[in-house]
Amino acid sequence: MSASPLKVAVTGAAGQIGYSLLFRLASGSLLGPDRPIELRLLEIEPALKALEGVVMELDDCAFPLLSGVEIGADPNKIFDGANLALLVGARPRGPGMERSDLLEANGAIFTAQGKALNEVAADDIRVGVTGNPANTNALIAMSNAPDIPRERFSALTRLDHNRAISQLAKKTGAKVTDIKKMTIWGNHSATQYPDIFHAEVKGKNAAEVVGDQNWIENDFIPTVAKRGAAIIDARGASSAASAASATTDAARDWLLGTPAGDWVSMAVISDGSYGVPEGLISSFPVTTKDGDWTIVQGLEIDEFSRSRIDKTTAELADERNAVTQLGLI
């Protein structure tokens, strides 16, 4: 365990997702049992007292890999030297708030954080955005960090990806480990397109194994796309532990690489692949190696999939237009 600690910054660290995430990171779920981690935790001033309590719990776990913890409300201080930033904190949608209000409220947060990352983060920084609306929040942060390569920003669609794998496993009676090449296209919203037409169940085409277009269209896709709302209805609170788990999965695969013969879903900046407008942060199938991602190329997109991809990317374009008009990018 001689390697220098990976400096991991987490925003919204005292929140529900943060509470699940920090213990996963400190226990070695991110980089395994040999790489120590230093946590740098950002919160708003009113939440710092609660965050102190979380740090007390982290101390009480005596995690061998946790080399240190720093907390604060100043992003320029907390992001200093960070190798990985997980932007979890975001303004939730309150009663009577329009989506444009939400974009504006979060715009201020992610503008400031993008600027701070640009100034003080380590040269090898990778930035994962979990706080919603994640795709557009990532776009805002990226646009305010001109010195950081644009491919270093990603928004979380791994939770949708994991949800889709789980639903497909349940339908086919397979194990989750039997399922490969799941894809989420587009926005982390109800318009997202979970695509099983390229996925495999035990090496066989998933759509053919299912053999039921009606299930795909009217059961599978809406269940995955609206899973967050279903959890709120059941639990009385939004999904936190599963979001933390997916945040860890996404960061681990980004840093350590995807397994051979498989890919993952990440929302990354579009280069125009699959007709997704250039410059949008949209979910694609990607492979990763040495901390870099590559969009999987050459997949055939049928008419059904095309219409779904177009719908979700149109929503992303609308969000980009809205934040452009607000002067956030």
From Swiss-Prot:
CDD domains, per database record: MDH_chloroplast-like (cd01338)
Superkingdom assignment: Bacteria
Physiological role: Catalyzes the reversible oxidation of malate to oxaloacetate.
Binding residue positions for NAD(+): G12, A13, A14, G15, Q16, I17, G18, N106, Q113, T130, G131, N132
Disulphide-bonded residues: none
Protein name: Malate dehydrogenase
Annotated GO biological process: malate metabolic process; tricarboxylic acid cycle
EC number: 1.1.1.37
Stated family: Belongs to the LDH/MDH superfamily. MDH type 2 family.
Active site: H188
Gene Ontology MF terms in the entry: L-malate dehydrogenase (NAD+) activity
Keywords tagged on the record: NAD, Oxidoreductase, Tricarboxylic acid cycle
Binding residue positions for substrate: R93, R99, N132, R163
Catalysed reactions, as listed in the record: (S)-malate + NAD(+) = oxaloacetate + NADH + H(+)
